[in-house]
């Protein structure tokens, strides 16, 4: 925990994308693409320390411990997706694949409407959690995401984000 707090304070001036880059798989910008960040306990702690530093506050250990306890048995991702219409986030489906098994999320947050990015691309920021049960800490997993190209849903975009859990602290 101390190492993560130091990392967050030392890198407080970096953007979220910069500080989380080593935990992120990025498929690029544009419709049907996106990025996924694995929120490990180390990264979660570092981000809380970064936030406290930016606000000129002390890092409160009880806040960090509560946050870590909350997600202790979870694999957590923050996902950024690019779509073609304002409500595309409503069609997003998540799966975590490991060892020929598919796991459904136990928690998903996706806003009902997207934000507009440059060149009118629609952007959705979401958070998804999966139970760690039956997934070892050194597993190679795939975060599989599918969403509609257009409101009718005839065509779908599919994004696959590969994570080797053993490589993330």
Positions of PLM-derived features:
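Conserved functional micro-motifs across diverse proteins
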Residues: 1-169
